[in-house]
């Protein structure tokens, strides 16, 4: 298969969510984002890739309604607008950089939290059991976070994000602090979940290698103030496994994405 990026993949239908000219200026005057345009379609696995501080996490928080844009708009397929009070209406799950588990609560109680906040009491226990089974923690419902490894804590965090059966899963560098073996294992588990559940995923990462392995589409961002520099399609079939990671296609895509990232950084420094 020839390795080639496309500048903008052709996707049909109304996006699940679209950022139109979004800008974000913080109270201290720092401009994190400027003229950010991004459309995410149903069932996509999209990664946001860029240098530290380019606004990737800020963009994710704006999509989730945890931060309001200073300029531009966030448009949803249902015509609504997200904020911290209405995220549930858009069925969003959010996985943060750290597991952020309540240390005094069991794994099951941590996973139950989004159900409580959304007022979803019916079949709560069954939902929790199903979410834990999906991430390989079926036998750890009554364990406490202190009893889990770093990878298991992140699995619990993913289960918590999945328990409300969100249509859109937002993930902010969830595996960055893990060792490479655990990270690769969780990459595979995440892809298996995505393929079986057909969620829409927006994934933030600093890693070229991780973005190529996971994504259908990679959005490369400029340094702060962040905007889209280019988009690349990874035209490799799923499921992906170790054979893809050791293939010439994978190496070629990594070079292309690395070159695009270097060009984005250069463009930002020259602006």
What is the meaning of each model-derived region?
Residues 49-51:
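The feature captures the beta-strand-to-loop junction immediately N-terminal to the Walker
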Residues 64:
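Helix-to-loop junction immediately C-terminal to a conserved catalytic motif
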Residues 72-88:
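Conserved ABC transporter NBD signature motif
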Residues 105-112:
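Short coil-to-helix segment of the ABC ATPase nucleotide-binding domain corresponding to the Q-loop/switch region
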Residues 116, 122-140, 192:
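Conserved ABC ATPase "signature" region
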Residues 143-146, 164:
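Conserved signature/switch motifs of ABC ATPase nucleotide-binding domains
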Residues 169-172:
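Catalytic Walker B motif of ABC-type/P-loop ATPase nucleotide-binding domains
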């Amino acid at each position: 298969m020839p390795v080639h990026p496309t500048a903008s993949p052709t996707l049909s239908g109304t996006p699940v969510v679209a950022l139109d000219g979004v800008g974000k200026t913080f109270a201290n005057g720092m401009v994190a984002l400027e003229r950010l345009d991004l459309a995410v379609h149903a069932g996509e696995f999209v990664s946001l890739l860029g240098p530290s501080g380019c606004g990737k996490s800020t963009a994710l928080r704006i999509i989730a309604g945890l931060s309001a844009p200073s300029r531009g708009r966030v448009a949803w397929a249902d015509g609504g607008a997200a904020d911290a009070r209405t995220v549930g209406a858009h069925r969003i799950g959010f996985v943060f950089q750290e597991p952020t588990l309540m240390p005094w609560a069991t794994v099951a109680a941590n996973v139950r939290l989004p159900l409580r906040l959304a007022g979803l009491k019916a079949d709560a226990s069954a939902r929790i059991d199903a979410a834990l089974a999906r991430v390989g923690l079926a036998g750890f419902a009554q364990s406490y976070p202190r009893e889990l490894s770093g990878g298991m804590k992140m699995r619990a965090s993913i289960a918590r994000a999945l328990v409300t059966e969100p249509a859109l899963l937002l993930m902010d560098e969830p595996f960055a602090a893990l060792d490479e073996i655990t990270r690769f294992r969780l990459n595979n588990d995440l892809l298996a979940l995505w393929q079986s559940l057909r969620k829409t995923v927006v994934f933030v990462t600093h890693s070229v290698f991780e973005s190529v392995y996971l994504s259908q589409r990679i959005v490369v961002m400029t340094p702060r103030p962040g905007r889209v520099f280019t988009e690349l399609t990874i035209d490799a079939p799923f499921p992906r496994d170790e054979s893809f990671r050791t293939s010439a296609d994978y190496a070629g895509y990594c070079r292309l994405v690395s070159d695009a990232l270097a060009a984005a950084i250069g463009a930002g420094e020259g602006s």
